UniProtKB/Swiss-Prot annotation:
This is Assembly factor CBP4. GO terms for biological process: mitochondrial respiratory chain complex III assembly. The gene is CBP4. The keyword ATP-binding does not apply. GO terms for cellular component: mitochondrial inner membrane. Residues 105-139 form a coiled coil. It comes from Candida glabrata (strain ATCC 2001 / BCRC 20586 / JCM 3761 / NBRC 0622 / NRRL Y-65 / CBS 138). Its main location: mitochondrion. It is a single-pass membrane protein. SUPFAM superfamilies: Moesin tail domain (SSF48678). The lineage of its organism: Eukaryota, Fungi, Dikarya, Ascomycota, Saccharomycotina. Pfam families: CBP4 (PF07960). InterPro entries: Cbp4, Moesin_tail_sf. Essential for the assembly of ubiquinol-cytochrome c reductase. It has a direct effect on the correct occurrence of the Rieske protein, core 4, core 5 and apocytochrome b. It is found in: Mitochondrion inner membrane.
Amino acid sequence: MDTPVWRRWLKIYIYGGSIILGGVLLFKYTTPTDEKLIASLSPELRLQYEKERKLRQEEQRELMRIVQETAKSNEPIWKTGPIDSPWEKKKGGEVVKNENFFDKIQKTRAEEAQKDELQRIREELDSLRAQSMKKTSDIVNERKSKDWWKIW
């Protein structure tokens, strides 16, 4: 004997709802928060993340400013505004090669890293020079105090 149609639909809704609810709960309780994810990183990666946070926020702010300007304009959506499109070409057919904001940020970040590395190397070199000068002066003072003609 067949069950009524409404019971079949009720089973479908119950099973479907339980699958969806189970998936949502599983996702909610198994996905780590941003803080937990950052805390689980190695110390080197966590330090790099903290250093680059300001840069990422600045990039996001600039991108949002560009998006808002583009949204206010009456131009078609495929015109990218200040961000250079890789598909836009000049009249002569050559690809436009302009440096956009994000390339400048990357270049600035690389220059800062290079300056930091040079500063670290200079400090290390200065400390090595100081150690070398100290050892040299110790050796010279030791030899001055021990003349070859003195017995004691």
